[in-house]
Amino acid sequence: MRLWATMMMAVSIGIVAGAQKDGSGGVHVDPAKVAAALAKGGPLVTRSDLLVQGSHREAAGQVEVHDKETDVLYVVDGEATFVFGGKMVGGKVSRPEQWLGTDITGGETHHIGKGDVFVIPAGVPHWFKEVPKSVSYFVVKVLKQ
C-alpha cells in the first residue's frame, strides 16, 4: 500500500513539475527551487485547480480544516506525530474556507517519517501535533472548483 501511494505521488508530481513548458500546460520546477522550498517552505506550482508546495516545520502546527482543498502530503525528511480525522476543538475561520483549531478529539495518530504519504480529503481535521526536530514534505493541494 505504501509503495502504491508513493508511486501515485511521484506520478502526480511528475505530471505537475516534470513536464517542459511546451504549451501543454506542463510546468518544470528547477531542483534548486525545490530544495529551497523544502528548506524554508514555499510554493512550487500555483494553478487554479491545484497548488504544489514544499514545506518545512521545526515545531507543531495548528489543527487545520480546508473546506475545498484535499491535501496530499509526501514526507521527504525528518519525523513528526501527525493526527487526522475526528473532530476539531476550538475551530475559528482563519481565511475563507479554512478553519484553525487547538486540538483534535477522536482522530488517528501516526508517527511519520521519510516516505510516508497521506491523503487528507476536504473537511477532515489534521495537524502536525509534535515535531521533535524537523520534518520536510511536499503538499499537493487539489482544489475543488
Where does each model-flagged region fall?
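Short solvent-exposed loop/turn micro-motifs enriched in small/polar/acidic residues
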Residues: 65-67, 103, 110-112, 120-121
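Conserved metal-binding segment of the jelly-roll/cupin
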Residues: 111-131
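Short hydrophobic/aromatic-rich beta-strand segments that constitute the beta-sheet cores
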Residues: 54, 82-84, 137
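A short hydrophobic beta-strand segment most commonly corresponding to one strand
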Residues: 133-145
